[in-house]
Amino acid sequence: MKVLLTATVQSHICQFHKPLVEVLHKHGCEVHVAAKNNLAEKNGLALDFVEKVYNVPFARSPKSPDNLKAYRKLKKIIEKEQYDVIHCNTPMGGIVTRLAARKSRKHGTKVYYTAHGFHFYKGAPKKNWIVFYPIERLFSRITDKLITITAEDYRLAQQKIHCQVE
């Protein structure tokens, strides 16, 4: 099985996903990463625990034209590699990846998104609900599985989101 992990920056994968990659390797998976290379500014971090790394110019700002470049590059990578599973992380990494993976889902690729904490939650500013909730709800339609970190996010996703929630 071939798995792609995406995030806005490579340091996110280094800091949070090494245990996941180890489990995937134990199950015989080949793991690739697509994210912006920011490791030069992160002393001691290296993506030496995956088979392939793609430098994709994601930007944290939704207004950045780099996200369009990231979308185009990622779409080509996904078409070339034909992944079985694409697991995306971080808000913009998740949005751009899910858009780029739409066609591959039609051919059986599963797309997972880990929400490391919704920006809309009980007590959050109304602005957060107005902006972020509709985006997550819409993008859940092109997501096979949403993985939540907190119990509050899990309960909210179970009620409001269109895909399978864990």
Spans of features found by a protein language model:
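Glycine-rich phosphate-binding loop signature in dinucleotide/nucleotide-binding domains
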Residues: I77-D84
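Short His-centered aromatic/hydrophobic patch
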Residues: C88-G94
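Short beta-strand scaffold positions
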Residues: A35, H87-C88, T148-I149
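Active-site proximal beta-strand in glycosyltransferases
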Residues: K2-L4, R102-F118, E136, I147, ...
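Helix-loop-beta element that forms the nucleotide-linked donor phosphate-binding surface
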Residues: L47-E51, Y154-E166
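N-terminal subdomain of nucleotide-sugar transferases
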Residues: M1-N37, E81
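Membrane-proximal helix-turn-helix segments that form the acceptor-binding/catalytic region
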Residues: E22-H27, R72, I130-I147
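Nucleotide-sugar donor phosphate/pyrophosphate-binding loop at the beta->alpha transition
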Residues: F16, P65-R72, K110, F120-L138
